Swiss-Prot record:
Pathway field: Cofactor biosynthesis; NAD(+) biosynthesis; deamido-NAD(+) from nicotinate D-ribonucleotide: step 1/1
Source organism of the structure: Dechloromonas aromatica (strain RCB)
Superkingdom per UniProt: Bacteria
Gene it is expressed from: nadD
Name of protein: Probable nicotinate-nucleotide adenylyltransferase
Regions annotated as coiled coil: none
Length: 217
């Protein structure tokens, strides 16, 4: 069986170093062969992004340009329908076959809300789920909704090598370097014409400035 493939979805509005570190560290912690970035087109769980889906896609393309282990999947941006994770996973499973191990990368906050996602239980039949958390702050079962806590207990794998042994169905957790960076923070800085340098790649910041993105209208 080939190495597990990480799947990293999000609005990336804009992509920043926190996103890049999560993707980079997941490869080392989880033994992934690479990470496929999947920018959302019309995210159903968030408000409408401030910039177009194509612009967010291009910013991710710029951010990951020099990392051979990163790849870009534009399918959700190109689709006209809202971006539901389970639909994307079904497409990838058809594309990559039943034996490829797929690992959905999510942060602890997003995982806590997993039970609100469309057909969330079906996700485990299609992929593993890897939950990143702050060092010293592991995922607490008591903080999860009952249904999700039950799934977490039943599916949790202590050894990440299990990700390669099966194509889907497990939950693993891993600590990642905590960077106090958020897309909301960056948008506020840019809207107020303050510097966002060193919070995101220079190539992305140059693109934002060239196209006058995130400015107050």
């Amino acid at each position: 069986m080939s190495e597990p493939l990480g799947l990293f979805g999000g609005t990336f509005d804009p992509v920043h170093f926190g996103h890049l570190r999560l993707a980079e560290e997941s490869i080392a912690h989880l033994g992934l062969g690479g990470v496929r970035w999947i920018p959302a087109g019309q995210p159903p769980h968030r408000g409408v992004p401030q910039v177009t889906a194509q612009q967010r896609l291009e910013m991710v393309r710029l951010a990951m340009a020099n990392n051979a282990r990163f790849s870009l999947d534009p399918s959700e941006v190109e689709a006209e329908a809202p971006s539901y994770t389970v639909h994307t996973l079904e497409r990838l499973r058809r594309e990559l076959g039943p034996l490829q191990s797929l690992v959905l990368l999510v942060g602890a906050d997003a995982f806590a809300g997993l039970a609100t996602w469309h057909r969330w239980r079906d996700i485990f039949a299609l992929a593993h789920v890897a939950v990143s958390h702050r060092p010293g702050f592991p995922v607490e079962i008591s903080s999860l909704p009952h249904e999700l806590a039950s799934e977490f207990t039943d599916r949790r794998r202590a050894d990440v090598r299990g990700l390669k042994a099966s194509p889907a169905g497990g939950i693993v957790t891993f600590a990642m370097t905590q960077l106090a960076i958020s897309a909301t923070q960056i948008r506020k800085l840019l809207a107020n014409e303050l510097s966002a340098r060193y919070l995101l790649p220079d190539s992305v910041l140059d693109y934002i400035q060239t196209h006058s993105l995130y400015r107050n209208s």
